[in-house]
Amino acid sequence: MNNEHRFEIDGITYLMTPANAMAAWQSLKRAGVLLRGMDADALTNTQGAASVALGAILSHLGDPAVTEIEALVFEQTAIKTPDGTTYRLSPDRLNEHFNTRRTHLLRVLMEGVKYQYSDFFAGGMAAFQELIPMPSAEKQ
């Protein structure tokens, strides 16, 4: 995992730093139930796994497991505005930040999910399938 992930939207710089591995792992396990029924063949490579997992998460917005992932992503994100102001996306800053930047919210969440969780899938799909059996893996 990179020490940071930086990207810009409309002049706002978003800087993400890694969450604690165990906190991220726990939230991923709770959200893992959302992946049940997914085609295991689509999860065989890191990019495919991240895309499928991201799609599953986005299709379950509002689920408590997804809310936990959102919180982890936002808590690990810092903002730098064009005038140099910096702050973290703490729970008390979310409304203030996104009320005038609604178009940023989904992109920040998607970037954060990929950054915080994709490395769990690299080389670990066999272990993940042990945790949550996938239908095509059961056929073999």
Swiss-Prot record:
InterPro entries: Phage_TAC_9 (IPR020351). Pfam families: Phage_TAC_9 (PF10876). It comes from the Bacteria. This is Uncharacterized protein PD_1186.
